[in-house]
Amino acid sequence: MSRFFSKKYSALTAYVPGEQPKDQKYIKLNTNESPFPPPQSVVDAAKSEAAMLQLYSDPECTPLVKKCAEHFGVKTSQVLMTNGSDEILNFAFMAFCDAEHPIVFPDISYGFYPVFAKLNGIPYEEIPLREDFTINVSDYVGIGKNIVIANPNAPTGIALPLSDVERIVASNSDNVVIIDEAYVDFGGESAVSLVDKYDNLIVTQTFSKSRSLAGGRLGFGIACPEIIADMNTVKYSTNPYNVNRMTMAAGYQALVENEYFANCVEIIKQNREFTKNELESLGFCVLDSKTNFLFAKSDKIEGKVLYKELKSRGILVRHFTLDRIKDFNRITIGTLEQMQRFIETVKNIL
């Protein structure tokens, strides 16, 4: 680091994203992207804005917010569009957390949560998952601190039922509860239906997973109008034009193409069950996933060794070094052909 780097960030361990190889020789099963491209109408919508890139985008994302509100059955004042769901999460941390308002989250979850906390000088606590990697809801009921929970969780893939989410939200009425629903379309229950009932609830989602726009960077939050206004204050104090014109147009059209994306999700879910069954037949322990990935380990091979062997054979998966999960690998679900290739490669390695 340089001699000018602020001391408040010098001890910060940055988030480490999944590998993005520059060549095309790998089957990428490591970053939970969709294996399916967006439909042509979405591509065309993005292209239609390219000729106007000399102009700033609409900071309010007006047509997209209206379409998103219509899609989810909420008011436009309850929606905030952002540059990926990471940005809405960071806005929430900045707006509602500080030394007097710490935040808690599971010890095995999205790696950005502790980074956001440290970046913004927010005290935080990581609450251990149970031995089976499920969340103990009682740990969060009435805890009296801000909360963020990924549901379904990542990297485990395990989902909480909506009734448990509501218990947590209802019992912490004086604190903000953020439900990160990046993977909800693959089998989870969305908490959007609870937003009108609880003014302390923020639901975040992304277009990166089920709507094939990871490269476009588009996410959003749904909450009561007052919460959205607070986060807009943070947004307009940092990056008013946070969603570019092409992404905004692509996102709008992606909300039109519901049938296409629902079909893609169904195929991914089928491929997930195929892969799970095949891995279990090989002796793997595979957690119950409601996402577009599987979290699996084998007693026959260490997690890091399997990761390296797969990479040497042209397949990327995600390995984590955290002690409790170091024997696991997270496997994104791709096309059936990709998953068949993955299974055959695993068989050869074992």
Region spans (language model):
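N-terminal "arm"/small-domain region of PLP-dependent enzymes with the aminotransferase-like
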Residues: 1-55, 143
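PLP-dependent aminotransferase class I/II
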Residues: 60, 200-280, 284-287
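Phosphate-binding glycine-rich loop
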Residues: 62-102, 120, 300
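PLP-dependent aminotransferase-like
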Residues: 95-150
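Active-site pre-lysine segment of PLP-dependent enzymes
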Residues: 134-143, 155-177, 181-213
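PLP-dependent enzyme catalytic core of the Aspartate aminotransferase-like
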Residues: 163, 308-313, 318, 322-350
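Conserved PLP-binding catalytic core of the aspartate aminotransferase-like
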Residues: 268, 281-313, 329
